[in-house]
């Protein structure tokens, strides 16, 4: 089994957390994000106060209100969730480019080759959790393990707002006690069948030969045999092509005016240029942009086609972006849109320069 360092990051009740962050009046009471009970709406997610009443994701809103009559259901704001997800992924990319998103609020990271914290996946996960909390004011749970299967289980082990680590030396003992219902790919039907066969834990499952499991479960029996031993060779796939590269910084003290923001630009641009220099040649930097998040979490992005990537161009963009809010700033970001050259052919100039 190859020794890798995989982190699974899962935001805690993500949609609900964003809503409670943006409207503190929602915190401390049962609330959910979902559709109207009058129109066969469904709960997308809910906070932990609502879960105490038995409310769950994918439950009909009508049934959720029967369980919890005081439940407040708010309409989803997907653009706000997408923006928060983009900010989280910006943090991820400081540590690795091997990121496999599973949804807006969940992703695998392969940090096997990361140089951060001398390659300590545990310290990287701790830093990610700290930065997300400081930057977005929401919590995430994380699991660290030698493979995806175990990392995902680990992230759920100490939810919410927890971190759990399974080291290579702990895999055999940890997996042996694991209920087979927790295995990746085991649904209710398979779990019921395993129970009828007297298989409750992975230790029981190890008593079955590979051939016997294949006879009983078909091709999935091969995977069951491996999972019972903590084996999962699936790679972290980063199939999506990037549309931009950027750096952001959340300041401990709000920047009070434009002059304070402009003073931070040189350091941000230096970090951006370092990141651009590490990119492969299949990307071409294009439009520059600036992002400003004000102290009240409102934000704006300003970009301009044809503008340069020099300090003065970014100063002008920042000035225009700041003018849209004119309030103290908690976060500044600078970046550039990318042209994806992979598989594309650059058009030759009709009259090349002499």
Swiss-Prot record:
It catalyses: DNA(n) + a 2'-deoxyribonucleoside 5'-triphosphate = DNA(n+1) + diphosphate. Coiled coil: none annotated. Pfam families: IMS, IMS_C, IMS_HHH_1. Residues 6-187 form the UmuC domain. The active site is at 106. Monomer. This is DNA polymerase IV. It comes from Pseudomonas putida (strain ATCC 700007 / DSM 6899 / JCM 31910 / BCRC 17059 / LMG 24140 / F1). The lineage of its organism: Bacteria, Pseudomonadati, Pseudomonadota, Gammaproteobacteria, Pseudomonadales.
